[in-house]
Amino acid sequence: MKKKRFNSDIEVQAFARHICMSAHKMRRVIDQIRGRSYEQTLMILELMPYRASYPIFRLIYSAAANASKTMGSKEADSLISKAEVNEGTFIKKLKPRARGRSYPIKKPTCHIIIVLKDKSKKPKSFLERKYGFVDKYMIGK
């Protein structure tokens, strides 16, 4: 599968993998925060009564720390541009039952992808990303 590109000048990604919760339960929380600002998202996640909100809270906090470290942007200027939950592998266990038998137990896991976008910065053009600058002769009047 082809990896999707993103604009690294104004966006920061954070991944969480193999979280022991079904993707359906996690999507219930992710759908509430998609497209909101960083501060508003943290407030919503603190007040939600779901168990799924804590791993998402930690991941968004980590993504904001990545943004401030790599891009030097303020956390207040961040916006959640993409929030995605995918199903992971199943953790398989055997539960002992009567007469020496065993029943399989499958626990679902999920993967979360959060992309934070900086509202204050504008995306660079292709030439600026490739060469680091844009000269008037490169544009070609």
From Swiss-Prot:
SUPFAM superfamilies: Ribosomal protein L22 (SSF54843). One of its GO terms (cellular component) is large ribosomal subunit. One of its GO terms (molecular function) is structural constituent of ribosome. Pfam families: Ribosomal_L22. It is found in: Plastid, Chloroplast. Its main location: plastid. Keywords: Chloroplast, Plastid, Ribonucleoprotein, Ribosomal protein, RNA-binding, rRNA-binding. GO terms for biological process: translation. The keyword Ribonucleoprotein applies. Gene3D superfamilies: Ribosomal protein L22/L17. InterPro entries: Ribosomal_uL22, Ribosomal_uL22_bac/chlpt-type, Ribosomal_uL22_bac/org-type, Ribosomal_uL22_CS, Ribosomal_uL22_sf. PANTHER family: CHLOROPLAST 50S RIBOSOMAL PROTEIN L22-RELATED, LARGE RIBOSOMAL SUBUNIT PROTEIN UL22M. This protein binds specifically to 23S rRNA. Part of the 50S ribosomal subunit. Belongs to the universal ribosomal protein uL22 family. This is Large ribosomal subunit protein uL22c. The lineage of its organism: Eukaryota, Viridiplantae, Streptophyta, Embryophyta, Tracheophyta. The gene is rpl22.
